[in-house]
Every structure is written in structure tokens, then in C-alpha cells.
């Protein structure tokens, strides 16, 4: 979440100064700061197209007036995206069928791979052969979308490898998954959690909002058992696949919302999706939450504050502060980290470790 409502904070030092004051009622020790490289740090980019005089340009929307402006280069985007952008544009300009009613493009990269999604205001079945030629000639994983339709050429799944404390963690996901869009910062974030766990007495882990297992796979070796929940069926399927890729056998996934899990743990409701999982077999010493911008609702806070240790990854300092007002009644902030996920913007990712008072 942007800090622009509080001031024009762009550098990590400026963000740090603001956060230090903003959270002073909860934390007065030193913050850990994790910087990103200044350029080519972002693995996802979404662009519009501008059509003029029968040719095509990449474009973005000005957030102030909502008007399109032409762009030629994205210095924040991964090098693979920057290298491929002119190749794709040149190809599209030469194919009238591909160019017609094309309104957007999404790029997604990992350390190894790149996928491209083209967005159309027309029936993409009519240009299927053109799209296939594009994929083959430019050697690219291609997805095309229009209303109610989706075509995939080669594959929509990407492989990723993260280096965490000398270990390689393998992942597979696609463009529909929520991903941390700065791989370097993602590795630093996971490593920060691992370094904290190295000093802890650990039993089992409860993780909410696990996605495709970004944190789950890296943290599993620290615990006897892990229960990870996620509402997206496709994310759960990727998480199960990622367990296979890493030969990990101590993670149990449940397709439940955090509110449903709360009801199940309190034995207020039974869920068929938990038929193979005995909640009473878990002894949670730690809980990890990585919620959306809205933060945690009261039912989730009431659930997690029962546990000894809480790791809270936040993309919104505003809702984080609101949640800490509740959590600080039972827990104390022991560590606070700032991750400069989006360089030279007012956005900031926070990591907080709390232990029971």
C-alpha cells in the first residue's frame, strides 16, 4: 500500500524515517532494512497499447489524469522483459490481425523463464494460427485472453528457483497466482524469517494465505508439521506440485479461508475439506500470515493471538498498524523489518515478528 497520503517518501531512508515514527508505540528498537537494486528488479509488468496511424506503441496510464502516454522502455522491469519488449512490438506491428483490437500485455518472468499474455477485445479463436506462429517464431510461452476465452501456446506455467540460506527451493506457478514481484527482495524476506526461526524453539507451523507455497516450502524444514491454508484451488494445486519438486512431505494444505479455519479450530463447524486432516494433532508454536491489503479481520486476529509466536508479512503499513493495536494486547513486537519491494515509489513491504507477552 502506498504511503503517498502521508508524504512523498521515495527512498528507503525516507520510508524508514516515516515508519519509525508511525509505529513508535509498538517498536522502538532498530529496524532491519533490506534494499533492492535500483533497476530491473520487477518480474511482472502490465502495459496498455496505443494505436496511431496504423501502428502500435506500448503505453501506460497517467494515474493523475488517466490518459495514456507512450513508453519505449521500463527501467524497473526485469532484463528479460526489457530485451523482449521491442522484439514483440516489431512482430505485432507487422501482423494486422494480431494488432487489431489488441489493448494490453502482461509480462511475467522468473530467473529462468518468461511468459507473455496478450489481451484482446475480439474473439481470439479467429487469430489462433497467428498467435501460434508468434509463439513459435519468438520462442515464447504465450497466453491470449479475450472475454470468456483463453488460449495457451507452449505453457502458462513458469519454474522458479530461490536461494535461501544455501538451499535451493523450487517452485512452479502461473500468471494467475499472486507472486512477490521482486525476486531479490522475496529471497531476503524469506531469509529474514528463517534467521528468526533459527533462534526459536519450534514445534508446528500454521500459515494463512499460503498461495502456491512461497514461504511454506522454505520454512517447512524448521518444523515437525505445517498446516497451510489458501482459498484458491489452483494455488493449492501448485503448492502440492511444489512439495513434489522439493521432496517435502510434512506440509498439509487445506483449501479454507482464514475465517473458516477459525471456525474449524474452535470446533464450531466441520468442513469436508478437512476430512484427511486432524487439527488436534498439531501443536502450533508459530503462525505466519501474509494477508492482502485489507489486513486481518477480527476473527483471524482472535485466532492467531492464541499462539506463542506470530510472523506478519504486510503490504500495507496502515492496516498493519490497526492490527498491531489488537495484537499488542497479547504480544510484543520483537523484530521489525522493512523491504523496499518497489524502489523509488511510496510502496513498502513490512515484516514483523511478535512473541507472547
Swiss-Prot record:
- Which reaction(s) does the protein catalyse, per the Swiss-Prot or TrEMBL entry? uridine(54) in tRNA + S-adenosyl-L-methionine = 5-methyluridine(54) in tRNA + S-adenosyl-L-homocysteine + H(+); uridine(341) in tmRNA + S-adenosyl-L-methionine = 5-methyluridine(341) in tmRNA + S-adenosyl-L-homocysteine + H(+)
| Disulfide bond annotation, renumbered to this chain | none
UniProt entry keywords in alphabetical sequence: Methyltransferase, S-adenosyl-L-methionine, Transferase, tRNA processing
Q: Which family does it belong to?
A: Belongs to the class I-like SAM-binding methyltransferase superfamily. RNA M5U methyltransferase family. TrmA subfamily.
- PANTHER family recorded: TRNA/TMRNA (URACIL-C(5))-METHYLTRANSFERASE, TRNA_TMRNA (URACIL-C(5))-METHYLTRANSFERASE
For this protein, the record's NCBIfam families field holds: trmA_only
Protein known as = tRNA/tmRNA (uracil-C(5))-methyltransferase
Amino acid at each position: 500500500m502506498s504511503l503517498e497520503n502521508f508524504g512523498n517518501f521515495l527512498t528507503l531512508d525516507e520510508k524508514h524515517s516515516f515508519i519509525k515514527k508511525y509505529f513508535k508505540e509498538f517498536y522502538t528498537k532498530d529496524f532491519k532494512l533490506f534494499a533492492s537494486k535500483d533497476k530491473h528488479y520487477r518480474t511482472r509488468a502490465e502495459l496498455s497499447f496505443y494505436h496511431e496511424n496504423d501502428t502500435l506503441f506500448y503505453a501506460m496510464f497517467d494515474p493523475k489524469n488517466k490518459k495514456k502516454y507512450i513508453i519505449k522502455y521500463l527501467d524497473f522491469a526485469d532484463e528479460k522483459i526489457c530485451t523482449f519488449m521491442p522484439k514483440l512490438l516489431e512482430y505485432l506491428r507487422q501482423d494486422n490481425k494480431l494488432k487489431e483490437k489488441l489493448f494490453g500485455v502482461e509480462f511475467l518472468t522468473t530467473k529462468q523463464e518468461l511468459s507473455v499474455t496478450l489481451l484482446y477485445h475480439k474473439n481470439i479463436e479467429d487469430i489462433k494460427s497467428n498467435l501460434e506462429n508468434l509463439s513459435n517464431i519468438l520462442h515464447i510461452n504465450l497466453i491470449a485472453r479475450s472475454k470468456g476465452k483463453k488460449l495457451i501456446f507452449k505453457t502458462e506455467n513458469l519454474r522458479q528457483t530461490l536461494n535461501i540460506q544455501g538451499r535451493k527451493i523450487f517452485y512452479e506457478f502461473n500468471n494467475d497466482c499472486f507472486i512477490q514481484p521482486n525476486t531479490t527482495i522475496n529471497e531476503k524476506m524469506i531469509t529474514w524469517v528463517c534467521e528468526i526461526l533459527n533462534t526459536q524453539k519450534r514445534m508446528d507451523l500454521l500459515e494463512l494465505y499460503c498461495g502456491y507455497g512461497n514461504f511454506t516450502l522454505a520454512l517447512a524444514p524448521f518444523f515437525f508439521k505445517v498446516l497451510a491454508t489458501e482459498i484458491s484451488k489452483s494455488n493449492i494445486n501448485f503448492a502440492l506440485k511444489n512439495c513434489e519438486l522439493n521432496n517435502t512431505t510434512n506440509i498439509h494444505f487445506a483449501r479454507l479461508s482464514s475465517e473458516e479455519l477459525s471456525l474449524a479450530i474452535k470446533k464450531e463447524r466441520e468442513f469436508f475439506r478437512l476430512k484427511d486432516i486432524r487439527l488436534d494433532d498439531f501443536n502450533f508454536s508459530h503462525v505466519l500470515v501474509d494477508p492482502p491489503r485489507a489486513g486481518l479481520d477480527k476473527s483471524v486476529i482472535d485466532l492467531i493471538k492464541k499462539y506463542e509466536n506470530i510472523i506478519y508479512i504486510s503490504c500495507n503499513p496502515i492496516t498493519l498498524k490497526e492490527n498491531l493495536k489488537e495484537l499488542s494486547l497479547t504480544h510484543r513486537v520483537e523484530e521489525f523489518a522493512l523491504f523496499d519491494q518497489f524502489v523509488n515509489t511510496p510502496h513498502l513491504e513490512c515484516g514483523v515478528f511478535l512473541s507472547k507477552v
